[in-house]
Each structure stands twice: as structure tokens, then as C-alpha cells.
């Protein structure tokens, strides 16, 4: 069953408001096994709305429309529907009575203006008139069109409680088994991910998508089939093939985060972690403590941004900083050892670098970063030369730090 999504609102087409309703609807429909034909965003112009509706209803099985159902002058969706399909607008008496009795008491808007909410195209089946939320279904040429408010929390509630159940019983819907997974990949460029997966020569029934989400690459795998056993077999074999092709560059799946995976690995091994940060300014600690229960494995950290803090809190020798510079492998190693001595953690990470935009030299340009780790199995320092903005360099530094620890914890130790 093909479905098209139309979002209406000048605030969307002008970029003033982010269109979150379409992405929510698409995700809900996709996970329920429907095909998304397309999504469009149009302004509050009746002629444009009408043309969009007529085009959509000709090419898909159902249409989902959000926005333009309110009581203000720029809410023109109902008017556009009536014009496009040649339908009179009629008052919904239940909504009308609610508007008069309730809304008039909680807003200064004229009752006559609020009554606009109750005037709907003939044949409109209101989802939840008692709630006062705009939203209805209209059948046109034996196809359902769902109209939802543009207010995100109202739209989401009606989508889940009314639209999805109605779609599930619609006679044109065939049940399709859907299996999907998102592979979260780090430290492998998108083109290399594509090259490796392309070599697998997966069948046309395997749908692959690549999505760069800085600083990661997300690969989506989708299998659909009317036979659930066939779909599951193909899904499992495709997952195995992708894992083999990408190896430990895959750090997690679906909604996993790097800090979550690192935390789980630390808990599994019964190990604790502490961090010493300079150029990342506490970003690693923030990522770790974003996870509930992180106190089980994360002891804490020191943000030693100024050189004096490196000496005072991490016991990094002043002479070492003067000789090698604050951004150096020697200082990174000393920071990792210093936080180890202060906290007694099983493993420690440290990072020092030049995030920019200033501070770089010919020998150490902006983006020079050193990440050190101290573990029961040895210490080491990794050198990086990152590109990008200050924020991107900081993010890359934090993510690579966690990835270094993840790879260490994956080993047979």
C-alpha cells in the first residue's frame, strides 16, 4: 500500500519551523509495513493545497496530510479540500458544541473564529471530537485521506491512536513482514562502506541505504516479504554478510550510541574508567554520563584546559609541557597516567589537541589531536589529524577516544 505525506504551512516552507511531523509519520508508517511514495511540504495556499491533493490521490492508495486545520486566517486546508473535490463544508455539531462550551472559556479569541474548527468538508469522519483536536478521515474515490493537525503532540497522538488502526483494517492493505536494522559504523568513510557492501552482490529484495550522520555512517537494511519465513531468512543472511564486510567498524545497531556500547563493555568486564580532557572540554565525560547508571563504571574526569590544571590536578611535569608542548604524545600519556593515579580506575583515557580555529602552527596545525589510554595491559598514544570546524574536531576527538576504548574492550583480555 503506497502512502504519500503532505505537510502544509508557510512556517514550514519558510524554514521558520522544522517539519518534524512528516518524519514521525513516515517512520510510523514504514515500521508498520507501508510504502512511502513521497513526502512534500507546501504553503498555506488553497490552490496549491488542492492541486497537491488531486495529484496524490491519483497515484497512491492513501494520503496523509498535516497542518492547516486550526482556527486562524491562515488555516486553509479544509477550504482547499472542499474546492478541490467539490464538497460543501458542513458544521460538525459535536465539535461546535465543544468549541462554544469549552474553548470560549480558556481563550480570548472570538467564538465565531473558533467555530471555524467545526466546519469540515462533507463526509469528514472526525477522529476524536471530544478532545477538541482537529483531525479527520475523508474517503475520496474509494481512497482514504487522513487530515491531522500540524501541532506535533496532537498529530502524533492522532497518528498512533486513529490513523494506524484505520489503515490496518483498510481493504487494500496486504500484510507484509518487515525486518529492518540500522548498522552504526564509525571510522570508515561512506564511500568505503558502500564499496564493501556492493561487493556482496545482495539480491534486489535487499534494500540498503547509506546515511552519513556526523561523525558516523548509518547503513539501513530493509527486507519485506509477504512470507515471514522467507523475509527472516534473507534478513539473517544479509546481516551476517554485512557484519563480515564491515567488521569491527560496526559498533552498534539501531539506537545504540558509542558511549552506551562502551559502558556495557565496561560493566561486562567489571572495569572502571576515568578521563582527562583538554581540547574536548568535558565532552567525553558528558557522553558517558548521558547514560543512566553510568556511575557503575565511570568514576569521573578532569577537564584540564589550562596547562596549570594539567600540572596541579594530573601531576603533568611543567618541564614536560615546556619541552614537548601541551599538545604532544608525551603530555597525553602523562595525563592518562595522572588521572589513573588520582582515581585508581582500571582504564583511563586522555585527549589533548588543537580544536581551532586558532592556535595551530606548521608543525602542529589545527586538528592535531593526541589520544592516550592507560590499561592493565599497557599504555599507548594515538595521533590524529582531524579536519573540520571547532565543534567537529571536538566531536571527532571524543568519539575516537571512546572508540579506542571500545576496541580495547573487544579484545580477548
UniProtKB/Swiss-Prot annotation:
Domain of life, source organism: Bacteria
Task: State one Pfam family annotation.
Answer: CinA_KH
SUPFAM superfamilies assigned: CinA-like (SSF142433), Molybdenum cofactor biosynthesis proteins (SSF53218)
Task: List the InterPro entries hit by this protein, alphabetically.
Answer: CinA, CinA-like_C, CinA_C, CinA_KH, Competence-induced_CinA, MoaB/Mog-like_dom_sf, MoaB/Mog_dom
The text of the family note is: Belongs to the CinA family.
NCBIfam families linked: cinA_nterm, PncC_domain
Write the protein's name. Answer: CinA-like protein
Amino acid at each position: 500500500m503506497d502512502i504519500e505525506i503532505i505537510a502544509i504551512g508557510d512556517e514550514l516552507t519558510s524554514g521558520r519551523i522544522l517539519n518534524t511531523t512528516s518524519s514521525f509519520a513516515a517512520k510510523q508508517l514504514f515500521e508498520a509495513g507501508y510504502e512511502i511514495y513521497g513526502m512534500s511540504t507546501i504553503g498555506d495556499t488553497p490552490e496549491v493545497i488542492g492541486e497537491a491533493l488531486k495529484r496524490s490521490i491519483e497515484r497512491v492508495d492513501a494520503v496523509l496530510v498535516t497542518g492547516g486545520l486550526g482556527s486562524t486566517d491562515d488555516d486553509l486546508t479544509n477550504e482547499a479540500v472542499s474546492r478541490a473535490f467539490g464538497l460543501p463544508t458542513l458544521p460538525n455539531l459535536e465539535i461546535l458544541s465543544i468549541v462554544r462550551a469549552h474553548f470560549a472559556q480558556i481563550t480570548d479569541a472570538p467564538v465565531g473564529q473558533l467555530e471555524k474548527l467545526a466546519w469540515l468538508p462533507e463526509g469528514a469522519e472526525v477522529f476524536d471530537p471530544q478532545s477538541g483536536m482537529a483531525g479527520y478521515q475523508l474517503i475520496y474515490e474509494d481512497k482514504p485521506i487522513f487530515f491531522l493537525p500540524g501541532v506535533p503532540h496532537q498529530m502524533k497522538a492522532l497518528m498512533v491512536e486513529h490513523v494506524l488502526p484505520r489503515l490496518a483494517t483498510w481493504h487494500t492493505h496486504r500484510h507484509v513482514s518487515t525486518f529492518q536494522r540500522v548498522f552504526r559504523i564509525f571510522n570508515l568513510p561512506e564511500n568505503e562502506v558502500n564499496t564493501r557492501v556492493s561487493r556482496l552482490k545482495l539480491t534486489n529484495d535487499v534494500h540498503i541505504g547509506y546515511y552519513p550522520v556526523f561523525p558516523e555512517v548509518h547503513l539501513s537494511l530493509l527486507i519485506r516479504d509477504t512470507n515471514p519465513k522467507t523475509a527472516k531468512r534473507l534478513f539473517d543472511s544479509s546481516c551476517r554478510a554485512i557484519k563480515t564486510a564491515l567488521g569491527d567498524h560496526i559498533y552498534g545497531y539501531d539506537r545504540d550510541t558509542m558511549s552506551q556500547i562502551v559502558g556495557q563493555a565496561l560493566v561486562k568486564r567489571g572495569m572502571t574508567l576515568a578521563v582527562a580532557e583538554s581540547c574536548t572540554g568535558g565532552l567525553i565525560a558528558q557522553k558517558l554520563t548521558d547514560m543512566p547508571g553510568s556511575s557503575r563504571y565511570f568514576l569521573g574526569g578532569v577537564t584540564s584546559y589550562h596547562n596549570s590544571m594539567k600540572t596541579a590536578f594530573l601531576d603533568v611535569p611543567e618541564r614536560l609541557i615546556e619541552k614537548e608542548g601541551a599538545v604532544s604524545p608525551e603530555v597525553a600519556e602523562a595525563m592518562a597516567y595522572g588521572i589513573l593515579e588520582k582515581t585508581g580506575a582500571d582504564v583511563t583515557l586522555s585527549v589533548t589537541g588543537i580544536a581551532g580555529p586558532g592556535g595551530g602552527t606548521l608543525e602542529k596545525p589545527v586538528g592535531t589531536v593526541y589520544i592516550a589510554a592507560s590499561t592493565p595491559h599497557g599504555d599507548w598514544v594515538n595521533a590524529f589529524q582531524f579536519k573540520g570546524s571547532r565543534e567537529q574536531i571536538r566531536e571527532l576527538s571524543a568519539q575516537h577516544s571512546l572508540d579506542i576504548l571500545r576496541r580495547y574492550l573487544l579484545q580477548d583480555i
